[in-house]
Swiss-Prot record:
GO terms for biological process: microtubule-based process; protein folding; tubulin complex assembly. It holds the Pfam family Prefoldin. This is Probable prefoldin subunit 3. The keyword Isomerase does not apply. GO terms for cellular component: cytoplasm; prefoldin complex. Coiled coil: none annotated. Heterohexamer of two PFD-alpha type and four PFD-beta type subunits. Belongs to the prefoldin subunit alpha family. It comes from Caenorhabditis elegans. Binds specifically to cytosolic chaperonin (c-CPN) and transfers target proteins to it. Binds to nascent polypeptide chain and promotes folding in an environment in which there are many competing pathways for nonnative proteins. CDD domains: Prefoldin_3.
Length: 185
């Protein structure tokens, strides 16, 4: 169960090695059956915590992708209106629940929320490039999280198998000791 640097995931999550020979593993790790159960339960809990944290992060990041798609669609519409030299009417928010209509003669620029209460004005092409780049970055993170979640699920399964191996080994050892004691009488 010793973790080495080459047995880590991309995010530094240690690999759980399958325990095939429980007795030699216990000897190597210098653990009793009870101590091994505690160690594996702790490891299992850590894996489950990391899994839930990654799932929450993946959900948050995945929710951003449709927002980028919508913004890109709007910018594409603005670019098309500008190319056709068409004006268009839109409604925009003045304050809570107060909207007004405006006619845009020739769209040239758009303002984009960057976060932390920062809005920046871009020309349409640069805005599209920025949003496309940001969408790609978010998609890359979602893909990485998907891969890491697959890895962590494998580690959880391996840890569960190891836990059952330890429990079964303990049961068999107690049965053997009981049989020896009953045979000695």
């Amino acid at each position: 169960m010793s973790d080495t640097a080459d047995s880590l995931s991309a995010r530094g999550i240690p690999k759980s090695e399958l325990i095939e020979d429980v007795e030699s593993w216990l000897t190597k790790e210098k653990l009793s059956i009870e101590e091994a159960e505690v160690v594996l339960r702790e490891k299992y809990g850590k894996y489950k915590y990391v899994e839930s944290s990654m799932l929450a992060q993946k959900v948050r990041m995945s929710e951003k992708i449709p927002e980028f798609e919508n913004s890109l669609s709007i910018i594409d519409t603005l670019i098309a209106k500008r190319a056709a030299d068409e004006s268009f009417e839109t409604t925009f928010l003045l304050s809570d629940d107060v909207y007004t209509k405006a006619t845009v003669q020739k769209p040239e620029k758009v303002s984009i929320w960057l976060g932390a209460n920062v809005m920046v004005e871009y020309d349409l092409e640069n805005a599209r490039k920025l949003l496309d780049k940001n969408r790609g970055s978010v998609q890359k993170v979602v893909d990485e999280l998907t891969n890491e979640l697959s890895y962590i699920k494998d580690q959880i399964t391996t840890t569960e198998v190891n836990m059952s191996h330890i429990v079964n080994f303990g049961v068999n050892k107690r049965r053997a000791a009981l049989a020896v004691n009953n045979g000695a009488k």
